[in-house]
Amino acid sequence: MANTAQARKRARQAVKQNAHNSSQRSTLRTAVKAVRKAIEAGDKAAAAQVFLASVSTIDRIADKKIIHKNKAARHKSRLAAALKALA
């Protein structure tokens, strides 16, 4: 239990930050799923377009340190490899 005013405020802020970060991670997962779905459909043009949008999302979330930069790089690398294999 938070005893000081500062600790109580930090606890309130942590709840808000956790909700925001969870939302951002959900957005990341949705973007990755969209690329996977486009690749499975076999439409290379659509998959490439969705891939570019997802890379932007991944980079933005990594820049905010919601996920680690290496995890972002791993996501982008695996999606790019899957897209390349579609050709």
UniProtKB/Swiss-Prot annotation:
Q: Which Pfam families does the protein's record reference?
A: Ribosomal_S20p
Give any single GO term for biological process. Answer: translation
- Region Disordered: which residues? 1-29
Give the record's keywords alphabetically: Ribonucleoprotein, Ribosomal protein, RNA-binding, rRNA-binding
List the Gene3D superfamilies.
Ribosomal protein S20
**Polar residues compositional bias: what residue ranges?**
20-29
Q: Which GO terms describe its molecular function?
A: small ribosomal subunit rRNA binding; structural constituent of ribosome
Lineage: superkingdom: Bacteria
The answer to whether keyword rRNA-binding applies is: yes
Instruction: State any GO CC term.
Output: small ribosomal subunit
Family, according to the entry, reads as follows: Belongs to the bacterial ribosomal protein bS20 family.
Q: What does this protein do?
A: Binds directly to 16S ribosomal RNA.
PANTHER family per record: 30S RIBOSOMAL PROTEIN S20, SMALL RIBOSOMAL SUBUNIT PROTEIN BS20C
Query: What name does the UniProt record give this protein?
Result: Small ribosomal subunit protein bS20
Q: Which gene encodes it?
A: rpsT
